[in-house]
Amino acid sequence: MAARPMLVVALLCAAAAAATAQQATNVRATYHYYRPAQNNWDLGAPAVSAYCATWDASKPLSWRSKYGWTAFCGPAGAHGQASCGKCLQVTNPATGAQITARIVDQCANGGLDLDWDTVFTKIDTNGIGYQQGHLNVNYQFVDCRD
């Protein structure tokens, strides 16, 4: 019977570790001009050519336009196809501004590449990110509520 409480404790610790692994702080976030509205929220449009288009381009317009777009290559969370369509709550800790963004692409900068129109400008409320060419943000994976 003593083994059962130990198992419960072990499972709780594992769950806490998994939850912690789905967020990161002080992550470099650059910007990219996906221009989703100008491209009819089409992930496969030549001007967009998002990595996740293979799996998500045929999703309904309401799904593709529900959140702003981001490329993801952050230090915590799944990468590649496994990250496609997932949502991140991205916070600018300098201002407290936050927004939910959908992962539609991959990147190579070790962080995020936020769409200029739908994400970056919404959390760069003091203009410092534009001046520096990037923001340092916090992110966590959240339920997209689709």
From Swiss-Prot:
Purpose: Shows antifungal activity towards B.cinerea and towards the wheat-specific pathogenic fungi F.culmorum and F.graminearum (groups 1 and 2). Has ribonuclease activity.
Keywords: Antimicrobial, Disulfide bond, Fungicide, Hydrolase, Hypersensitive response, Nuclease, Pathogenesis-related protein, Plant defense, Pyrrolidone carboxylic acid, Signal
Induction: Up-regulated by fungal infection, salicylic acid (SA), benzo (1,2,3) thiodiazole-7-carbothioic acid S-methyl ester (BTH), methyl jasmonate (MeJA) and wounding.
Keyword Signal among record annotations: yes
Residue pairs linked by disulfide bridges in the UniProt entry: 52-84, 73-107, 87-144
Pyrrolidone carboxylic acid modified-residue sites: 22
EC number: 3.1.-.-
Organism: Triticum aestivum (Wheat)
Molecular function terms, GO-annotated: RNA nuclease activity
Pfam families from the UniProt entry: Barwin
UniProt activity-regulation remark: Inhibited by 5'-ADP.
Signal sequence annotation: 1-21
Gene Ontology process terms (BP): defense response to bacterium; defense response to fungus; killing of cells of another organism; plant-type hypersensitive response
Effect of residue 134 to L: Loss of antifungal activity. Reduces ribonuclease activity 92%
Subunit structure: Monomer.
Top-level taxon in the UniProt lineage: Eukaryota
Protein name per the record: Wheatwin-1
Outcome (variant: residue 32 to G): Loss of antifungal activity. Reduces ribonuclease activity 60%
Residue ranges constituting the Barwin domain according to the UniProt record: 22-146
